[in-house]
Amino acid sequence: MNHNTLSSNWYQDKEIFELEKKYIFSKSWHLLGSINQVPNKGDYVVKTINHQPIILTRDNDNTLNTFYNVCQHRGCILLEHQGNSKQIKCGYHGWTYELSGDLRTARGFDKELIDSKKYQLKPIKHYIWMDQIFIKFNDDDNDLKKILKKIEKIIEPLNFSEYKYRKRDTYKIKCNWKVYMDNYLEGFHIPLVHPKLNTVINYKSYKTQTFDDFSMQWCFLNPDSSPYKNSKDNNKAFYFTIYPNILFNIAPGRLQTNTIEPIDEQNCNVIFDYYFEDVSEKKIKEDILFSEEVQNEDIYICEKVQKGLKSDGFNQGIFSEKYEIGVSHFQLYISEKINNG
């Protein structure tokens, strides 16, 4: 275990941030969303990941596709937000594409002079697990499938393919993305920062376990105060982190996925997607309100930490071997990726 934290410059230095983009985010799997976000033919949704604009579509053959959200004529961004359409049309010069990514029309050009294969939308590799869609910008292999298999084994018999997508919330937070990750990776702060959450979970049962490229926190829930559907055999909460920035928050009847998207060295977006099993509308609203309360408490503390890291009065801290092994494990992962290139 690392006993000392990363020094404060790791949370402020633009050069380190650029190295993270190059050596970590460009080589990692990223969570794009769920197939439930594009349930119908013609549906599309967009997202920016590692400063790259992405489209997810369900085409007329009912096939899921992932592309760069960029017109191949002059590089204009094609789509915004989400919607349903029979084609993708560039608002700059009018080139159109099929939802499969194939070039449909090239306004201003003779059809026989355009190589339609060359100018189709650029595809991105993707992988689907329990209806969750992961993408990767390069073809290097890594252990995502092994990680997901381990998670699947731990949480069985849960199957998120049976859960329904409800909503997405995006929070812009004034902190380095690692500040948010560090905060997520320990429950040490819960009694002080999250008083209501502390009554929902059984804090004495809280445990952390680390693996190669992911970690798990889990605890029992207090049945008298938990807002979740649970039984004697199903009263646990799990918090999985797939490095560098994919989070699964699992409670009985509910899945939240979070992705932490760096904006720059001192700001990040946190994207929450909510999925529910067969629970009542009342329970869904209670869960969302409760989650928003916890998130706002985390935002407050993370932004305070970012301000403190700028101080001349702090450079490097120390980890608790009992409560902060997840943070230590993550920071070791980050430093090794950067230092080894």
Question: For the regions a protein language model found, what residue spans apply to each?
Answer:
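Short, contiguous pre-domain boundary segments
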Residues: 1-10, 161
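Short, solvent-exposed coil/turn linker segments
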Residues: 7-9, 20, 33-34, 115, ...
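Non-catalytic accessory segments flanking enzyme active sites
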Residues: 10-49, 54
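Generic structural signal for secondary-structure transition and capping sites
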Residues: 25-29, 76, 189
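Short Pro/Gly-enriched beta-strand edge/turn motifs at strand-loop
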Residues: 27-39, 106-109, 239-244
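Rieske [2Fe-2S] iron-sulfur-binding domain
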Residues: 38-139, 145-153
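C-terminal catalytic domain of Rieske-type non-heme iron oxygenases
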Residues: 57, 63, 69, 127-128, ...
